[in-house]
């Protein structure tokens, strides 16, 4: 017999809550950006991302192994591709074609070595290098006259560098592409060599050199493509994705790339072509709270990211950007805590952000507490702890440290379990002055401009 008991509102609410609750794995899967990222990365740069996904599984994933095989089968990394083939097919020995291809690659390496030997030896000599100038045409003339160097010999450096890159010999490839770039006057090949060298520096973890190449690629986009806006948009989109590697792996790069992404041309590119990059820019701005000494710059970046998240919310959102929306646009502290919890799972499953997850959570808790304290005179420690995702004991310790570190004017009433904020009274006159100060300054500037 069917149960005819009527469904209550509480039953519906509980069912909805249970249905809405998602596991960490579901949250991570729903917010996986890998399909979007790989369309803007070279195949060699995609490999570390696949490796990261594979490392998260307890057992080797056949899907990841097949993806690696498909990714690298057209490269010269024959030995590794052969091992992947054996793993996929469950055999001990790879087909003979891999041994044949390996032999062909070794022969090509030997030929390239012979063809480039003269020019690489010359570029390794101090007396030759000191004779080079910034004028590439003059350099080629000098090398042709003094050492019988030809354009064909210079182009061999480019071809050899590409070949070494395909073999996975990134250090050797970087050196060859650098030498080619010093001498070549072929703009297209020089641009390609710069992208190639950037990839090499990323893959070898030479972050300072990678940042130099990021700047060179940026300059190339601005100068060589200045009259081709669509090409600029395309190249900037790719550079934004490649720059994520030093962005979160090299501390000194954080401020430089933040400034780059916030620049008008690049923030426009992000909003137009790749709004999912807002996850990384938002995470960088939030974590900058714990590392920057320039409070003014940090506040400006925070205001900018709030504005951009608001503009792009219809186009892109994830728990990281939703945290900003909940806290600064909706002023919903419960939703902010929920999104922070989800954002933590997203960061832990993101190749670029996994190392920043703890700093992000810590900085986000500071932002929640700062916003909460601004609008409350007396704060219940238990309530604030819950909003920060902490138990009462941990929350109390965290709040004590916050008051000590930020030197905020507040007292803890342990008996009542509350924090009493001492907000200095602000007169109506002072508020009017603060609000009109900026307008008065702008009026002065405009008046001066008109007077000229």
From Swiss-Prot:
Sequence ranges of Polar residues compositional bias: 1-17
Compartment list: Cytoplasm
Predominant location category: cytoplasm
Any one Gene Ontology BP term: formation of cytoplasmic translation initiation complex
GO cellular component, one term: eukaryotic 43S preinitiation complex
InterPro entries: eIF3e, eIF3e_N, PCI_dom, WH_DNA-bd_sf
Gene this chain is encoded by: int6
Function statement: Component of the eukaryotic translation initiation factor 3 (eIF-3) complex, which is involved in protein synthesis of a specialized repertoire of mRNAs and, together with other initiation factors, stimulates binding of mRNA and methionyl-tRNAi to the 40S ribosome. The eIF-3 complex specifically targets and initiates translation of a subset of mRNAs involved in cell proliferation.
Organism this protein belongs to: Botryotinia fuckeliana (strain B05.10) (Noble rot fungus)
GO molecular function, one term: translation initiation factor activity
Subunit structure: Component of the eukaryotic translation initiation factor 3 (eIF-3) complex.
Name of the featured protein: Eukaryotic translation initiation factor 3 subunit E
């Amino acid at each position: 017999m069917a149960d005819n008991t009527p469904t209550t509102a509480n039953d519906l609410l509980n069912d909805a809550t249970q249905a809405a609750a998602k596991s960490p794995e579901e949250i991570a899967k729903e917010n996986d950006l890998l399909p979007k990222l790989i369309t803007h990365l070279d195949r060699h740069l995609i490999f570390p991302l696949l490796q990261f996904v594979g490392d998260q599984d307890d057992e080797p994933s056949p899907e990841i192994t097949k993806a690696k095989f498909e990714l690298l089968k057209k490269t010269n990394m024959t030995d590794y591709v052969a091992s992947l083939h054996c793993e996929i097919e469950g055999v001990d020995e790879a087909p003979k074609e891999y041994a044949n291809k390996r032999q062909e690659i070794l022969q090509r390496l030997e030929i390239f070595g012979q063809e480039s030997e003269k020019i690489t030896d010359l570029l390794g000599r101090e007396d030759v290098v000191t004779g080079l100038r910034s004028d590439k045409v003059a350099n080629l003339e000098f090398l042709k006259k003094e050492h019988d160097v030809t354009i064909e010999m210079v182009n061999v450096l480019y071809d050899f560098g590409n070949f070494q890159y395909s073999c996975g010999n990134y250090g050797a490839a970087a050196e060859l592409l650098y030498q080619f770039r010093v001498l070549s006057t072929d703009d297209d090949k020089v641009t390609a060599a710069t992208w190639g060298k950037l990839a090499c520096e990323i893959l070898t973890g030479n972050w300072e050199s990678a940042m130099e190449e990021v700047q060179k690629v940026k300059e190339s986009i601005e100068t060589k493509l200045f009259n081709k806006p669509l090409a600029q948009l395309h190249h900037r989109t790719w550079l934004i994705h490649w720059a994520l590697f030093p962005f979160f792996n090299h501390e000194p790069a954080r401020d430089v790339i933040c400034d780059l992404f916030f620049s008008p041309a690049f923030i426009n590119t992000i909003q137009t072509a790749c709004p999912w990059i807002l996850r990384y820019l938002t995470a960088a701005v939030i974590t900058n709270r714990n590392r920057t000494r320039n409070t003014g710059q940090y506040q400006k970046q925070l205001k900018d990211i709030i504005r951009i998240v608001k503009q792009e919310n219809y186009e892109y959102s994830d728990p990281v950007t939703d945290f900003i929306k909940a806290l600064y646009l909706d002023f919903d502290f419960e939703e902010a805590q929920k999104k922070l919890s989800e954002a933590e799972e997203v960061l832990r499953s993101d190749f670029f952000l996994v190392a920043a997850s703890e700093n992000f959570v810590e900085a986000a808790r500071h932002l929640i507490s700062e916003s909460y304290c601004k609008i409350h005179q007396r704060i219940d420690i238990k309530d604030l702890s819950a909003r920060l995702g902490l138990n009462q004991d941990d929350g109390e310790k965290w709040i004590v440290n916050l008051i000590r570190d930020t030197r905020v004017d507040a007292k803890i009433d342990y008996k009542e379990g509350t924090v009493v904020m001492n907000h200095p009274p602000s007169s109506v006159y002072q508020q009017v002055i603060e609000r009109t100060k900026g307008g008065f300054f702008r009026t002065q500037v405009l008046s001066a401009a008109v007077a000229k």
